[in-house]
């Protein structure tokens, strides 16, 4: 048995690769079922965010090739096109990696909290698909507990640092004052909600939220004093936008070059600041060719987030120490599973001997045999049944000069050293 992580993230693959490897929410269930159908896979979960796609599997063996082939087939990749971007971890490496990811230590912005919620969503999706069992369920729960401990015991999450926060910081560098500006947020998930909060805290003039589900946009707009529209209405409102932040789960771009050309004419080429946080992208890359447009993707934000690293280095070191302990705790549990199964089998075998002997003893009592004789027979029978197999194995170990087995048996049965 092995536990595998296989995936890509913002450090190993550009956005053009990550967007092709992303699994939209509506495709997760079928993808998980296809994955669990592989004969090598016992349990599986998929984490798919803007910055990473990772597959977690409990495998029979350590061959990751079937998982790579499955990923290529799912996302229409040739092996040579994807292998250079993939990373993998096994067992302790997987445990440590998942703990670090959940704590935000592997994120574009060190310590960002959103990833923990995304991992919980990934686990819930796998539960609903019926693809997680004892091992991954325990691992996810320990991952969540480790992340909680890190955030409680260190300062890793004290300041509001996230991709959304970095986007607003970038906007503040381009515009002196947000108070006279209009921002359109496309989507209504956690990233957009966080962006809306940061914009409101920085006193944005007007806020418009566009979403495929109007009710969700309306709820979010009410929360932050904004105005809700549907995605169908977005093109006619585009000219109002000084700032656009997009983060949906759409498999195809929502806004193209033509929409922005029209908006810029209406704005008389007043600049537009656009941040596309979605993977796959919500905004066609060709929009960047337009004058008076400042288009940034999640990859571009890397330069901004580097400024946040210095203040979190000490907290990150403390977090790594906590993770070291948590990894060892989980490994201890994992190592104990083989012993647990053996203990269960030994107990089951002993109970079978007990039940058989007890039934015979009860029959003898009903036939009038004395209780004392029956109890003596029962005690002798149980003793012989229980020690027969280990006694035979110990004797055979002596014949084969396996002193290690004999010594292990003395330790197992807590026998005193014969020389003392």
From Swiss-Prot:
Binding positions (substrate): 49-52, 107, 112-114, 118
Record comment regarding domains: Possesses an unusual extended V-shaped dimeric structure with each monomer consisting of three distinct domains arranged along a curved 'spinal' alpha-helix. The N-terminal catalytic domain specifically recognizes the glutamate moiety of the substrate. The second domain is the NADPH-binding domain, and the third C-terminal domain is responsible for dimerization.
MF (Gene Ontology): glutamyl-tRNA reductase activity; NADP binding
EC number: 1.2.1.70
Keyword hit for tRNA processing: no
UniProt pathway annotation: Porphyrin-containing compound metabolism; protoporphyrin-IX biosynthesis; 5-aminolevulinate from L-glutamyl-tRNA(Glu): step 1/2
The organism of origin for this protein: Methylococcus capsulatus (strain ATCC 33009 / NCIMB 11132 / Bath)
Site (Important for activity): 97
Transmembrane segments: none
PROSITE patterns to which the protein is assigned, alphabetical: GLUTR
Subunit structure: Homodimer.
Residues the record lists as binding NADP(+): 187-192
Key words, A-Z: NADP, Oxidoreductase, Porphyrin biosynthesis
GO biological process: protoporphyrinogen IX biosynthetic process from glutamate
HAMAP family for this protein: Glu_tRNA_reductase
Phylogenetic lineage: Bacteria, Pseudomonadati, Pseudomonadota, Gammaproteobacteria, Methylococcales
Keyword Oxidoreductase: yes
Protein name per the record: Glutamyl-tRNA reductase
Functional summary from the UniProt entry: Catalyzes the NADPH-dependent reduction of glutamyl-tRNA(Glu) to glutamate 1-semialdehyde (GSA).
Catalytic residues as annotated in Swiss-Prot or TrEMBL: 50
Family affiliation: Belongs to the glutamyl-tRNA reductase family.
Catalytic function, reaction form: (S)-4-amino-5-oxopentanoate + tRNA(Glu) + NADP(+) = L-glutamyl-tRNA(Glu) + NADPH + H(+)
InterPro entries: 4pyrrol_synth_GluRdtase, 4pyrrol_synth_GluRdtase_dimer, 4pyrrol_synth_GluRdtase_N, GluRdtase_CS, GluRdtase_dimer_dom_sf, GluRdtase_N_sf, NAD(P)-bd_dom_sf, Shikm_DH/Glu-tRNA_Rdtase
Other observations noted: During catalysis, the active site Cys acts as a nucleophile attacking the alpha-carbonyl group of tRNA-bound glutamate with the formation of a thioester intermediate between enzyme and glutamate, and the concomitant release of tRNA(Glu). The thioester intermediate is finally reduced by direct hydride transfer from NADPH, to form the product GSA.
């Amino acid at each position: 048995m092995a536990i595998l992580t296989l995936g890509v993230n913002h450090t190993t693959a550009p956005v053009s690769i990550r967007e092709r490897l992303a699994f939209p929410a509506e495709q997760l269930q079928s993808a998980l079922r296809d994955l669990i159908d592989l004969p090598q896979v016992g349990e599986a979960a998929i984490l798919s965010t803007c910055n990473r796609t990772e597959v977690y599997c409990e495998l029979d063996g350590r061959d990751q090739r079937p998982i790579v082939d499955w990923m290529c087939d799912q996302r229409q990749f040739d092996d040579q096109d994807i292998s250079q971007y993939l990373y993998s971890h096994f067992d302790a490496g997987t445990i440590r990696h998942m703990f670090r990811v959940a704590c935000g230590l592997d994120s574009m912005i060190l310590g960002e909290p959103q990833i923990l919620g995304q991992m919980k969503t990934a686990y819930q999706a796998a539960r609903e698909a019926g693809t997680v069992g004892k091992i991954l369920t325990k691992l996810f729960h320990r991952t969540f507990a480790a992340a909680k401990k890190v955030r409680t015991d260190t300062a890793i999450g004290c300041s509001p640092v996230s991709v959304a926060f970095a986007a607003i910081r970038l906007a503040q560098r381009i515009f002196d004052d947000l108070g006279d500006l209009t921002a359109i947020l496309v989507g209504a998930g956690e990233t957009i909600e966080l962006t809306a909060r940061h914009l409101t805290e920085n006193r944005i003039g007007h806020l418009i939220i566009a979403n495929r589900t109007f009710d969700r946009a309306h709820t979010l707009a009410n929360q932050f004093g904004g105005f809700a529209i549907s995605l169908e209405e977005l093109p006619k409102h585009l000219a109002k936008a000084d700032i656009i932040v997009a983060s949906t789960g759409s498999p195809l771009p929502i806004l193209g070059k033509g929409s922005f050309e029209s908006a810029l004419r209406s704005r008389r080429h007043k600049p537009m600041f656009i941040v596309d946080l979605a993977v796959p992208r919500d905004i066609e890359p060709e929009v960047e060719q337009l004058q008076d447009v400042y288009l940034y993707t999640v990859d571009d934000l890397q330069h901004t987030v580097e400024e946040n690293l210095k203040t979190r280095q000490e907290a990150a070191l403390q977090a790594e120490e906590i993770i070291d302990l948590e990894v060892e705790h989980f490994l201890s549990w994992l190592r104990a599973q083989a012993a647990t199964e053996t203990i269960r089998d030994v107990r089951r075998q002993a109970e079978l001997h007990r039940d058989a002997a007890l039934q015979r003893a009860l029959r003898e009592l009903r036939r009038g045999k004395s209780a004392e004789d029956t109890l003596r027979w029962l005690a002798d029978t149980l003793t012989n049944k229980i020690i027969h197999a280990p006694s035979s194995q110990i004797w055979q170990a002596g014949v084969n000069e396996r002193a290690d087995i004999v010594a292990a048996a003395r330790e197992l049965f807590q026998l005193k050293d014969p020389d003392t």
